[in-house]
Amino acid sequence: MADLIPLAQARCVPRKGSDHKLGEARLAELLPQIPGWELSEGGQALSRTFRFKDYYATMAFVNALAWIAHREDHHPDLGVHYDRAVVRFSTHDVGGLSENDFICAAKTSALTEQLP
């Protein structure tokens, strides 16, 4: 799916079971498509810290991200602070990373281009 259209324009689909867990080769293909994100927890999650000028900007980002998570039915773990938000994606149902994590990471990155 992500090979045909940009990740930020793709949609999440339900993924359950270890057969949907991405292997190292696929992770290496997808990671360059989401600059600023890094593999964490031994390659089991994606994370990125987004920095903002103040709490209002941080919360605007978090609220917009909540809408994306709701629409895609794929929810991140968040650490929310005055001037930053730490975003972590992983697919618990596959025991690691799935394409849904990369799709949502790309959509999350795109938010920073749209918010003040």
Curated annotation (Swiss-Prot):
<protein>
    <recommendedName>
        <fullName>Putative pterin-4-alpha-carbinolamine dehydratase</fullName>
        <ecNumber>4.2.1.96</ecNumber>
    </recommendedName>
</protein>
<dbReference type="InterPro" id="IPR036428">
    <property type="entry name" value="PCD_sf"/>
</dbReference>
<dbReference type="Pfam" id="PF01329">
    <property type="entry name" value="Pterin_4a"/>
</dbReference>
<comment type="similarity">
    <text>Belongs to the pterin-4-alpha-carbinolamine dehydratase family.</text>
</comment>
<dbReference type="InterPro" id="IPR001533">
    <property type="entry name" value="Pterin_deHydtase"/>
</dbReference>
<keyword id="KW-0456">Lyase</keyword>
<dbReference type="GO" id="GO:0006729">
    <property type="term" value="P:tetrahydrobiopterin biosynthetic process"/>
</dbReference>
<dbReference type="GO" id="GO:0008124">
    <property type="term" value="F:4-alpha-hydroxytetrahydrobiopterin dehydratase activity"/>
</dbReference>
